[in-house]
Regions:
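N-terminal secretory signal peptides that target proteins for export/translocation
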Residues: 1-11
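Extended, histidine- and acidic-residue-enriched regions that form the cofactor-binding/catalytic faces
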Residues: 29-91, 95-104, 108-114, 121-139, ...
Length: 299
């Protein structure tokens, strides 16, 4: 009889461990969804999501000349990161925010020019709407040097007005930590969002002889990207490199390597840790800072 109980006890212990292990796996994995794109979900699906979480990733881009890539490549890059981040952290993605400040690339006729002061109110209106809808954890993503001129005022002013600490991540800094090749990441990004064929194979770009600005490099190094001094590129070919023909096989290989670099960047980023840090920071603000200093803080 004791052997029977011993056998039963061992089996019960194994079953219990398996159950606990399965529960931990489920807890660590984000729930499956039909899509993470808010614009592809029904209102019912969005409201069901908001019952369990409040995280949304907002890729913000620009449309500009960029060598052999489509002009929206610096929107597609953050979009791919947002999609993967949302899958990892159980968030949603708000797409289609592609038209913001490009910087000095306005010399290319494919560049759409919106100033930071024009883009900021639009983003702030979206942020307010998202907060009212229930998205308190808003994470804005860019991969474009001049973007901080629009996004940094957004997160600072929105926090002062609402006391909701939304976050801005410039993906370039994270990619550098992961030693990622920026061009290959773009190939990978188009693959992630299902648009790899949008990168052309047989485009050749020629840059005409033109003078270079003798003082620009010294001056631009004195401040943040495009924020130290106003300037324009001397030729569209100076931004993104010159387009060169590639084969379909090369494009597929670059995309494969780029996706791996995106994944490596996300590992460095620790997306779940970022979201938890936002919750901790928000709680500290609400529980400690506001009760102590609320009467003198900006309204």
């Amino acid at each position: 009889m004791s052997k029977v109980f011993a056998t039963f006890g061992a089996r019960f212990a194994r079953l219990t461990l398996c159950t606990i292990g399965f529960a931990l796996i489920c807890w660590c994995q984000a729930p499956q969804m039909r899509t993470r794109y808010l614009t592809s979900l029904t209102n019912t699906e969005i409201e069901e999501y908001l019952k369990r979480n409040d995280v949304i990733f907002i890729p913000v881009g620009n449309v500009e000349v960029h060598g052999g890539f489509p002009t929206d490549c610096e929107y597609v890059g953050p979009l791919a990161f947002a999609q993967k981040m949302a899958e990892e952290a159980d968030g949603l993605v708000l797409p289609n925010l592609a038209y913001f400040f490009p910087g000095g690339t306005v010399v290319g006729k494919g560049t759409i020019y919106i100033t930071p002061s024009e883009g900021l109110p639009y983003l702030k209106a979206i942020a307010r709407s998202l907060l009212r809808q229930g998205f308190r954890r808003q994470i804005y993503l860019t991969d474009h040097g001049p973007s901080p001129q629009t996004l940094s005022p957004l997160v600072r002013e929105f926090f002062d007005e609402t006391k909701d600490p939304i976050l801005y991540i410039e993906m370039g800094s994270l990619m550098r930590k992961a030693h990622a090749d920026f061009n290959k990441v773009l190939f990978g990004a188009y693959s992630v969002v299902g648009r790899l064929d949008d990168i052309p194979l047989n485009v050749t770009q020629v840059m005409q002889e033109h003078p270079s600005d003798p003082g620009l490099n010294k001056l631009q190094a004195l401040g943040p990207g495009s924020g130290a001094i106003g300037a324009y590129f001397g030729d569209p070919g100076e931004h993104g490199g010159l387009a060169k023909p590639i084969t379909a096989e090369q494009r597929a290989q670059f995309a494969k390597e780029g996706v791996a670099m995106i994944d490596a960047t996300l590992k460095v980023a620790d997306v779940k840790g970022i979201v938890q840090a936002m919750r901790d920071h928000d709680k500290f603000t609400q529980d400690v800072i506001l009760p102590k200093y609320g009467n003198i803080l900006p309204k």
